[in-house]
């Protein structure tokens, strides 16, 4: 049976993404000075104000005001007439120390306390910073090993920001959203783009027809592949007819409210934990990255066309309480064999994940817009395919 599936993305100027980028910029600043920083920073942005709060244990000193303003200005909120700008907005900060009760379990895992875990170094004794379940996914329907709807949505959002910032379309403002609907055939292969939707903030003196014509030429045509188009493809641009007031002055933004945009566009479940503002001892972040790393290597090794893994943790314990896989009927070998190989090859302890992916670095602001997965950036170590040969041995 044919089916339609839709995913969305947002630009870096979307209020929730402004909040995510501020939280991750603060995290980066702390990790740069003190890689052992424990950070959980939340941000709220609304008309004329940014509020930063959270729990932090660090030896670093960072200028919160300066980081917040610079991040907002870099995104493009540079003029007071936007209702929110980095020069004039108020910045409030309320940050306090991490709970010592949580630190007890993170600093030294339950297994280490009970003598079950003999680790080479302090990092490998780290326990999970919280309970929860994390999902990783990969599919061979795109070269990035990501679902096509979310990848096209991200690429449209990135292009929308690019043509705004480089002056190609000077009437655009920072806020924007994209959405792509893909038709899949009976074999679950993407065959065509059914609908492209772009909503973008703009200057008041430009018409909707001018916006649509410009976006088709400079954003949609360069991104949507010719082989996925037909004369039935629908293009929707600013369906309300007007989008002048946008950004935090129109919608309050909060850290962690775009978790589906951040991951797989709704193609698979999500454990619920957000990423931004959290240091890698928080398995909400590090275990999600590691689960993606495992899934991508499994699919790239040819063990399955689609692969999902769920990992779950208990606070203060190093080893996961469960690991589950699903190949959606696409496995090229026995699923039990795949799971056994994964558990032998990959170490799911938080400290081991941090070491393997080199996560104690100031790399996180780059993750905070346009997806944490599917981008081949040097800092995104979880996108590496360095375990493919090891996994191929089980075929």
Curated annotation (Swiss-Prot):
Gene Ontology MF terms in the entry: ATP binding; magnesium ion binding; methionine adenosyltransferase activity
Residues annotated to bind L-methionine: 55, 98, 251, 282
Cofactor: Mg(2+); K(+)
Flexible loop, as annotated region: 98-108
Amino acids binding Mg(2+): 16
Keyword Chloroplast (UniProt): no
EC category: transferase
Protein name per its UniProtKB record: S-adenosylmethionine synthase
Free-text remark on how the cofactor is bound: Binds 2 divalent ions per subunit.
EC number: 2.5.1.6
Catalytic reaction list: L-methionine + ATP + H2O = S-adenosyl-L-methionine + phosphate + diphosphate
Taxonomic lineage: Bacteria, Thermotogati, Thermotogota, Thermotogae, Thermotogales
Family that this chain belongs to: Belongs to the AdoMet synthase family.
Residues reported in the UniProt entry to bind K(+): 42
Stored NCBIfam families: metK
Pathway assigned to this chain's UniProt record: Amino-acid biosynthesis; S-adenosyl-L-methionine biosynthesis; S-adenosyl-L-methionine from L-methionine: step 1/1
Keyword ATP-binding recorded: yes
């Amino acid at each position: 049976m044919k089916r339609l599936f839709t995913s969305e993305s947002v630009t870096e100027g979307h209020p929730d993404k402004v909040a995510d980028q501020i939280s991750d910029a603060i995290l980066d600043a702390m990790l740069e000075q003190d890689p052992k920083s424990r950070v959980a920073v939340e941000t709220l942005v609304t008309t004329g104000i940014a509020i930063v709060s959270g729990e932090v244990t660090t030896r670093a000193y960072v200028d919160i005001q300066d980081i917040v303003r610079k991040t907002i200005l870099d995104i493009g909120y540079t003029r007071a007439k936007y209702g929110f700008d980095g020069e004039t907005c108020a910045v409030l900060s309320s940050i306090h120390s991490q709970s010592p009760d949580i630190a007890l379990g993170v600093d030294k895992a339950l297994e280490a306390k009970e003598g079950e875990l003999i680790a080479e170094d302090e990092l490998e004794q780290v326990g999970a910073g919280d309970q929860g379940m994390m999902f990783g996914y990969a599919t061979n329907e795109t070269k990035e090993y990501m679902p096509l709807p979310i990848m096209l949505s991200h690429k449209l959002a990135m292009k929308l920001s690019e043509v705004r910032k480089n002056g190609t379309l000077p009437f655009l403002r920072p806020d924007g959203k994209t959405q792509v609907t893909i038709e899949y055939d009976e074999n679950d292969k993407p065959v065509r783009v059914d609908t492209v939707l772009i909503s973008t903030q703009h200057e008041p003196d430009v018409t909707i027809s001018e916006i649509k014509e410009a976006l088709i030429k400079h954003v949609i045509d360069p991104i949507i592949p010719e082989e996925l188009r037909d004369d039935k493809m629908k293009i929707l641009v600013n369906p309300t007819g007007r989008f002048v007031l946008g950004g935090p002055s129109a919608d309050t933004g909060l850290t962690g409210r775009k978790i589906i945009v951040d991951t797989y566009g709704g193609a698979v479940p999500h454990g619920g934990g957000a990423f931004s503002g959290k240091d890698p001892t928080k398995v909400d972040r590090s275990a999600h990255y590691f689960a993606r790393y495992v899934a991508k290597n499994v699919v790239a090794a040819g063990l399955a066309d689609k692969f999902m893994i769920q990992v779950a943790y208990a606070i203060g314990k190093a080893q996961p309480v469960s690991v589950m896989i699903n190949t959606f009927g696409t496995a090229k070998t026995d699923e039990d064999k795949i799971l056994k190989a994964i558990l032998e090859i990959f170490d799911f302890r938080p400290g081991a994940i941090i070491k393997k992916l080199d996560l104690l670095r100031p790399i996180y602001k780059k993750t905070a817009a346009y997806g944490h997965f599917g981008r081949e950036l040097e800092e995104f170590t979880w996108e590496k395919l360095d375990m493919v040969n090891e996994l191929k041995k089980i075929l």
